[in-house]
Amino acid sequence: CCGVPNAACHPCVCKNTC
C-alpha cells in the first residue's frame, strides 16, 4: 500500500516502524 492513496494504509505499516 506504500505510495498508494489509501486512507486505510498508514506510513508506519509500509515502513515497518509500527
Curated annotation (Swiss-Prot):
It is found in: Secreted. The modification Cysteine amide is found at residue 18. Disulfide bonds join 1-9, 2-14, 12-18. Keywords: Acetylcholine receptor inhibiting toxin, Amidation, Disulfide bond, Hydroxylation, Ion channel impairing toxin, Neurotoxin, Postsynaptic neurotoxin, Secreted, Toxin. The keyword Disulfide bond applies. Its main location: secreted. The modification 4-hydroxyproline is found at residues 5, 11. Changing residue 10 to P: Dissociates very rapidly from the fetal muscle receptor. Expressed by the venom duct. One of its GO terms (cellular component) is host cell postsynaptic membrane. One of its GO terms (molecular function) is toxin activity. The keyword Lipoprotein does not apply. The cysteine framework differs from the previously characterized alpha-A conotoxins. It also differs in its disulfide bonding. It is why authors propose the novel nomenclature Alpha-A(1-3) conotoxin OIVA. The cysteine framework is IV (CC-C-C-C-C). Alpha-conotoxins act on postsynaptic membranes, they bind to the nicotinic acetylcholine receptors (nAChR) and thus inhibit them. This toxin blocks the fetal muscle subtype (alpha-1/beta-1/gamma/delta subunits) (IC(50)=0.51 nM) with 600-fold greater affinity than the adult subtype (IC(50)=310 nM). It blocks the elicited currents completely and it dissociates very slowly from the fetal muscle receptor. This toxin causes an apparently irreversible paralysis upon intramuscular injection into gold fish. Belongs to the conotoxin A superfamily. This is Alpha-conotoxin OIVA. It comes from Conus obscurus (Obscure cone). The lineage of its organism: Eukaryota, Metazoa, Spiralia, Lophotrochozoa, Mollusca.
